[in-house]
Amino acid sequence: MLTAGVENVNRDFRLFTGRANPGLGKEIGSILGVELGKIAIATFPDSEIHVQIEESIRGADIYIVQPTCEPVNDNLMELLIVMDALKRASARQITAVIPYFGYARQDHKSTGREPISAKLVANLLVSAGADRIISVDLHATQIQGFFDIPFDHLTALATLASYLKEKHVENGVIVSPDVGRAKFAEKYADLLELPMALMHKRRAGVGGTDVEVKAEIIGDVRGRTPIIIDDLIASGSIYKHADSLVAEGANPAYISITHPVLTDDSTQRLNRPSIQEIVTTNTIPVPAEKQIDGKVSVLSIAPLLAEAILRIHKHKSVSKVFLDQQVIFPV
């Protein structure tokens, strides 16, 4: 891993942050040993966003940290305007560091006459000036293919798995919430040397509608401590999985997710006996009111992002990040 200090980067390097997660940007800067670039961002009374770059960046290699989390549209628009300002100020290259990629769940048309919003966002980012994208644990990995510029797809898997390994979860079992996350769960299971189980949703059509019948548990969970994994937690519906597992004789569950989207009503759903801890990262800020009585443990993704940024800036392989963590993941 990298060693902090100003010697890691040169004078052509600049790190900026938007207002979506300034704490993460500052932490990345601290690890790299650089101060954040000088930028003024304001919102006018009519909700328009104004940006002023307050230092010369001509010919510089720019990294702008801005997850497009809630409020998604405001933070996305702010990122686009910042990149436009950077481009017009003659930045040599602009890398958008988007730890959480909003609209990633709208990656395809589920029914007719729907947009593919993730593709639209990709087009907007490139049009605004992005030359490269860095993101973490996309909800749909195929979004990388929406871009014709380099896209570095990182994963928080090792960060989360290391924490769970130190917890010494007794008689643990990795649980995938659905078939789509099975491969991701398998990587967790390999890292933690634990068995794996799968929640399989069986559906049946009634009167022309698609109605969920039940979630079957494939695998042995009785007497074990489940670790339910996913890329994000939003509405809090994952609590149903925890309840189902406990009903089958499992211990209260850990939930391990990268992105704590946590909508307003989700915290009430997640504060229940079937869930003992939610382990997540700071790709999105988690305010105190969403800490769910201390059940939420937030790990820092800054070291991973700092390592990737430094390697890109120095034209080194980003895949080395994953080799160091003994993780095989598409980048």
Annotated model-derived regions:
Residues 1-331:
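PRPP-associated nucleotide enzymes
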